[in-house]
Structure formats: structure tokens, C-alpha cells
Amino acid sequence: MTNLGSGLTRRRLLAAGGAAAVAGLAAPALANTDPIRVGVLQPLTGGLDALGVQGLNGATLALLDANDSGGVNGRMFEIVQADTATDPKTCVERANDLIRRENVSAIIGPVTSANRDAMRPTIERAKMPLLYATDYEGGVCSRYITCYSALPDHWVTPMVAYANEMIGNSFYLVGSDYVWPRKMNAAFVAQVSQLGGTVAGEEYTPWGAKDFTATLRKISDSEVKTVVVSIAGADAVTFVKQFAAAGMNKEIRMIFFGFSENYLAGLSPDESEGILAPTNFTSSLTSEDAENLKGLTAKRFGTDAIVSNTVDAHWTLTRMYIEGIRRAGSDDKEAVTDAMVDQSIRSGNGEVYLRASDRHTDLNVLIAQAQGGKMEVLKDLGRISAANQCG
């Protein structure tokens, strides 16, 4: 176990990313109540490390800042960190550890839909609040799963309309071989069909793919205007590098679902130039809300810390959970589950709203483009309310 105090740094977070680690946060000397233990279950190894660290940073930022302000209801937070290893079986094992051995009051994570779906029965049996802050394909309706997640209504529908107007209506779809890319692409195909466009090809790549030559050849031969990417993690960086090395980025536009500052860190400006992505936050924003999040992140993790959509989502949802505890007057799981919904809060990109009807969030949506190694906003779509996921 590793103690992570208020002087937490990004380097120390990364170093703590193996087995479950308890972040012991010292309570004031006069405190006489037990700390509230919160599990942060993220992929800190296994190919989605960058996303996992960003999720951990966002949750940690909210919890440590709450402690610095005296905690909630006179109680401090204690972080219990665990690694899914980007593997559904491991994710379930770690979830069981957090629930049975670590006695956490809530779990923040994981990242992939495959991991979330694998652990869902465990969560619902234990009646354990799960705070899920990753974009996904939609359809989760559970009392115990609260989502700060961009759904196809947030990202796919406006992105297809934008591409149809600004680029063209022919597409080739490439994704990792799991549920999120497949269902996102199904939504994409449906939207393209409604607008009279064409999807020339659709394929899915295994985890750990190293050579995309055959896929790139098919894309080139299809003569489409746009390639749509939903490859996850390190594989996505490999794909973009090979796409650029083949000179295809000069002729074919790329829409990349989930693209953010996380990926920019692994690409040169030339390799990332022109990539389009829907997002809910980007660090190029200069609003008061964005500057607040960037300032808090720099103060906590250092000025070189990445501030991405993933950080914002986990930071905001964790603060919603903290407010739920304040409203409930305790960390009782059922009471907090009831108390944290029907809540508006300031994110890094304006006010968002957590619905009681399906425990999903109305989000502010941007269309951004990689320019000169940064994500620049092309269009601010404002707040979008997705369809009820329990309807």
C-alpha cells in the first residue's frame, strides 16, 4: 500500500499504479469520525494507461480539494486505488476486492464498456454506487451506475451532421474490437443513412495491433472523404502514426471519437494535424470554468500535467458524488444514491445537469480539431440532452 498525501504529484500517481494502493489522507487532529473510503478503479496498465491516469487524476483532484476544504459533513476522504489492467476479469476481481476487503463507499471507474459490463453484476449485487465518467455507447439503466458520459446523441449525431456539411458524406469506419466501437459505429451508420451518405467499409482491429497496412490500403482504395476512428489507447496512436506516414492525412480527413490531449502527447503536431473530434472539454478553452480546472490541476499535479476531457469528467462526477454525501448527511450508499441526482454543477466547460430519470448527464458539447499540437474549438454546440437511457 502507498500513502498519497496532500503533496500528491503526477509522477507519484504513476508510480503507484500497480496493485491496489490506499491513499491515506490525514484528518484534522480533532476529527472523531472515520474517513470515507472511495475506490478509484482505472486501467493503469494494459494499453489504456494514459486514460487511466487521467481518470485517477480527475477523481483525486476532487477528493483532495474536498479534504483541503475540511472534507464533507466533518469527514475526510481516503482514496483506495486499483488497476483493472484493461482486462474485464481483472476488473471484476479488483471490484470485489474494493467492496469486500477495502469496504469502500463508492467506486469511480472503469474506462472500457467491456470492463463496466463485466463488473455490473458485482456492483448491483453489492448495491455499490459506481461512478462512470467515460463516453460510451448508451443503454445502461441501473440504480447503482451514475454516468457522466457522452452518448451517441452527444457525439455521433452532431459529428455526422458537421462532416456532411463541411467535408463530404462518404466514410470508412475503423475501431477496436469491443462493444463501444461497434455500437458507436452502428449509430454512426444510422445517422449517415438518414443524411443520404455512404459507409464504404467497417472493420475492427484486435487489441495490441502493430501493423495497419492492410487496413490503410482498404481505406485508400475506398476513395472516401473521411475515416472514422474508434480505436482505443496505444493502438490508436499507432494507427494515426501509420496513417500520417502513408501521407493519407493530406487527402482524407479523420474523425476520431475519444481523441483528446491524452493522444496529442504521443503524436507529433504533423501527425495529429487536422484530426476532428467531438468532446465536452478541451484545455484550449479560456472560460472562467476552464481556467479554474486548469489552475487546480496545475496546483495539484504540476504545470506540465495534462488537462483533458477525461480529467474534467472524473473531476466533475466525483464532485457530484461529494455533493450527494453532503445532501444525504452521510455516506450511506442508498441515501447518497438518491441524493446525488437532480443536480447542476459547474464543469470545466460550463454548467451540466445530472438527471434523476436515468442517472445520466446533460453535457456541453464541442467540435474540436488538432491544430499545431493543440485541440482548438471549431464549434460550440452548447448543452445537449441525450435520450433517456431508461426509456
Placement of each model-derived feature along the sequence:
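Sec-dependent signal peptide hydrophobic core
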Residues: 17-21
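Extracytosolic ligand-binding ectodomains
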Residues: 2-5, 9-15, 31-391
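N-terminal signal peptide c-region/cleavage motif recognized by signal peptidases
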Residues: 26-28
